[in-house]
């Protein structure tokens, strides 16, 4: 039997500051990463050698491309991921305080993953 972990839910881009301890308004440089708890779980599971699959929706945009390419590189099955031209991929900007605690600012209404339907 081939067991598969299927995750369903949000897929977004996390923009993480290159410097810690700054207010979001003062940050000049970010790195982009795939984000969303389901995406993180699928990628981590695949990196451990298990089969994982994602059911979500991303925009037909550069950020959606980045998510799909990153998941593919992690060996995550993306055959159930939908693409839409109607809504963009969700974005999250993450502020990190001096201790590394996170504070999120989301840009997700409207966004692709919130409009996933059967």
Segments the model singles out, each with a brief description of its role:
Residues 51-118:
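Conserved N-terminal subdomain of the carbohydrate kinase-like
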């Amino acid at each position: 039997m081939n067991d598969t972990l299927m995750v369903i839910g949000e897929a977004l881009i996390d923009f993480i500051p290159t410097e810690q301890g700054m207010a979001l308004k003062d940050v000049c440089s970010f790195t982009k990463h795939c984000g969303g708890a389901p995406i993180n779980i699928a990628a981590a599971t695949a990196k451990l050698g298990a089969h994982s699959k994602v059911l979500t929706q991303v925009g037909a945009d550069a950020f959606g491309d980045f998510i799909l390419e990153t998941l593919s590189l992690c060996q995550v099955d993306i055959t159930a991921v939908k693409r839409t031209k109607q809504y963009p991929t969700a974005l999250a900007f993450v502020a990190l305080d001096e201790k590394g605690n996170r504070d999120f600012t989301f840009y997700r209404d409207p966004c692709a993953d919130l409009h996933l339907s059967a």
